[in-house]
């Protein structure tokens, strides 16, 4: 090792401030299979070299501080420090770089997403030498992945529990999201499930407010589930939101859901926190409950291109912490999400192994070993005319959540559910027959509407509804 990167006690202590790059920029370093690797989008302040900025990120997110301290001599920092080992300029940007940092596995507590993020996306994001900083991707080594339980059950086990194969899972978020009484809420759940949906969902805003306490909602929703199951012969469920102000209260709600015999509960994993989410995931596996995950607050963290954390990192963190579903954007609906980027983190959720893919924004190869996959959920501003595109984009292993696209049907909730189920079945049949959903999608929906008055009415209501705004977070492209 070169003298300038040597930090062992034998060097001796010399007080003062030195450049980060003398210790933490190590372009000769070859990452180990056990290292956690991070790709940061770094925007230095004017006059700060990229090497110093990248080294500062490595230092401040691992063992470094702003000055030399004598206690450095009491340990081997070369064993524990983060290393900025490679820097690429961002195409099309004058002062922006992708800095790759390797972290030794010794730095992190086993099975703790909370500890990973406390270090890697902690105080360094407020560092004055940086104008902006964004964590674009992480490579989690198998040695660390195996310290996590991961999703409670995974895709195949969920399909077996529900006895649903060969198509997407179809759901609906109950609206209005706030203000319904528990009994009226249960009525809406029943009507949607009876009409052909597999699941209904608590809106993420619904916890236990004065107008509808959680226990009442759980009871009326369970009654709706059992009634719809008896009438349709299909397994049904409702995502009962167990998110609460304390972990103890959250688990209490999950316990009550299990006692009711329902198949699934729900958690807001970002607002609730990773520690709470991991605890709930463990409870769900131990007690046979599926776990639906909502990502409320994600856009605060991931929407800006130059600062924060990309959702692909949050998706990987969720697969570690645990969840059987997670909302992942729609591409075609009202919420942010470019197609290639969205499919990139959909791959990270479902597949056992993903390669580096510049076209999908994947910076590292990632193996998940035996960790179960997570079903991506498309939700937000989608309706029957979107069904061909959603079927083509996401494939069978996904969940479609139509809120307004079900409850906004002019004939009521059950006909809205019928319209969505007919549209889905028509698209699946057309795909299985070899038809091109991208080119023939509208024709497929119109043909199905000829024998389904519910679908015909839905088509008429939403024929002009589009959300054509450019995505904020897009792939980097070179300036012409």
Curated annotation (Swiss-Prot):
Biological process (GO), any one: reductive pentose-phosphate cycle
Cofactor(s), by name: Mg(2+)
Function: RuBisCO catalyzes two reactions: the carboxylation of D-ribulose 1,5-bisphosphate, the primary event in carbon dioxide fixation, as well as the oxidative fragmentation of the pentose substrate in the photorespiration process. Both reactions occur simultaneously and in competition at the same active site.
Chief location bin: plastid
Active-site residues, record numbering mapped to chain: 175, 294
Residue positions, PTM N6,N6,N6-trimethyllysine: 14
GO cellular component terms listed in the entry, alphabetical order: chloroplast
EC numbers for this chain: 4.1.1.39
Name used for this protein in its record: Ribulose bisphosphate carboxylase large chain
Cofactor note text: Binds 1 Mg(2+) ion per subunit.
Note: The basic functional RuBisCO is composed of a large chain homodimer in a 'head-to-tail' conformation. In form I RuBisCO this homodimer is arranged in a barrel-like tetramer with the small subunits forming a tetrameric 'cap' on each end of the 'barrel'.
CDD domains to which the protein is assigned, alphabetical: RuBisCO_large_I
List of residues that carry N-acetylproline: 3
Catalysed reactions listed for this entry: 2 (2R)-3-phosphoglycerate + 2 H(+) = D-ribulose 1,5-bisphosphate + CO2 + H2O; D-ribulose 1,5-bisphosphate + O2 = 2-phosphoglycolate + (2R)-3-phosphoglycerate + 2 H(+)
Keywords, ordered alphabetically: Acetylation, Calvin cycle, Carbon dioxide fixation, Chloroplast, Disulfide bond, Lyase, Magnesium, Metal-binding, Methylation, Monooxygenase, Oxidoreductase, Photorespiration, Photosynthesis, Plastid
Modification after translation: The disulfide bond which can form in the large chain dimeric partners within the hexadecamer appears to be associated with oxidative stress and protein turnover.
Amino acids binding substrate: 123, 173, 177, 295, 327, 379
Chain positions listed as propeptide in the UniProt record: 1-2
Site (Transition state stabilizer): 334
Cell compartment(s), UniProt: Plastid, Chloroplast
Class of enzymatic activity (EC top level): lyase
Organism listed in the record: Trianthema portulacastrum
Similarity field: Belongs to the RuBisCO large chain family. Type I subfamily.
Residues bound to Mg(2+): 201, 203-204
Positions of post-translational N6-carboxylysine modification: 201
SUPFAM superfamilies listed in its UniProt record: RuBisCo, C-terminal domain, RuBisCO, large subunit, small (N-terminal) domain
A molecular function (GO) term: monooxygenase activity
């Amino acid at each position: 090792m070169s003298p300038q990167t040597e930090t062992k006690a034998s060097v001796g202590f010399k007080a003062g401030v030195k450049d980060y790059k003398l210790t933490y920029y190590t372009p000769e370093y070859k990452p180990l299979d056990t290292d956690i690797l991070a790709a940061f989008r770094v925007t230095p302040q004017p006059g700060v070299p990229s090497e110093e900025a990248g080294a500062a990120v490595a230092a401040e997110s691992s063992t470094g501080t702003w000055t030399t301290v004598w206690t450095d001599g009491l340990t081997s920092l070369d064993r524990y420090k983060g290393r900025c080992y490679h820097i690429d300029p961002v195409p099309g940007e004058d002062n922006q770089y992708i800095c790759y940092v390797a972290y030794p596995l010794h730095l992190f507590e086993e099975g703790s997403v909370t500890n990973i993020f406390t270090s890697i996306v902690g105080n360094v994001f407020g560092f004055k030498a940086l104008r902006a900083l964004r964590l674009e991707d992480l490579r989690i080594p198998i040695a660390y992945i195996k310290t996590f339980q991961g999703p409670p059950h995974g895709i195949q086990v969920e399909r077996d529990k529900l006895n649903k194969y060969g198509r997407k899972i179809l759901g609906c978020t109950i609206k209005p999201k706030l203000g319904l009484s528990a009994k009226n809420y249960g009525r809406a759940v029943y009507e949607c499930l009876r009409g052909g949906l597999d699941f209904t969902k608590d809106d993420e805003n619904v916890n236990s407010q004065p107008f509808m306490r959680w226990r009442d909602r759980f009871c009326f929703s369970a009654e709706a589930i059992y009634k719809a199951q008896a009438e349709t012969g299909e397994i049904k469920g409702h995502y009962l939101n167990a998110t609460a102000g304390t972990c103890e209260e959250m688990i209490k709600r999950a316990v009550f859901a299990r006692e009711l015999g329902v198949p699934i509960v729900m958690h807001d994993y970002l607002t609730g926190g990773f520690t709470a989410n991991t605890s709930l995931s463990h409870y769900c596996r131990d007690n046979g409950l599926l776990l639906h995950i909502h990502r409320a607050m994600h856009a605060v963290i991931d929407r800006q291109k130059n600062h924060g954390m990309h959702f692909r990192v949050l998706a990987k963190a969720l697969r570690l912490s645990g969840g059987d579903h997670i909302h992942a954007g729609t591409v075609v609906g009202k919420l942010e999400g470019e197609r290639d980027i969205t499919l990139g983190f959909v791959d990270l959720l479902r597949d056992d192994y993903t390669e580096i893919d510049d076209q999908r924004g994947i910076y590292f190869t990632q193996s998940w070993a035996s960790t179960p996959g997570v079903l991506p959920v498309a939700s937000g501003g989608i309706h029957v005319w979107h069904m061909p595109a959603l079927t083509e984009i996401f494939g069978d292993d996904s969940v479609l959540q139509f809120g307004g696209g079900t409850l906004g049907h002019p004939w009521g909730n059950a006909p809205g559910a019928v319209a969505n189920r007919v549209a889905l079945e028509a698209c699946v049949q057309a795909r299985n027959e070899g038809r091109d959903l991208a080119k023939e999608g509208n024709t497929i929906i119109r043909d199905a509407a000829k024998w389904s008055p519910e679908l015909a009415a839905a088509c008429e209501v939403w024929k002009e509804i589009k959300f054509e705004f450019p995505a904020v977070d897009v792939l980097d492209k070179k300036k012409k």
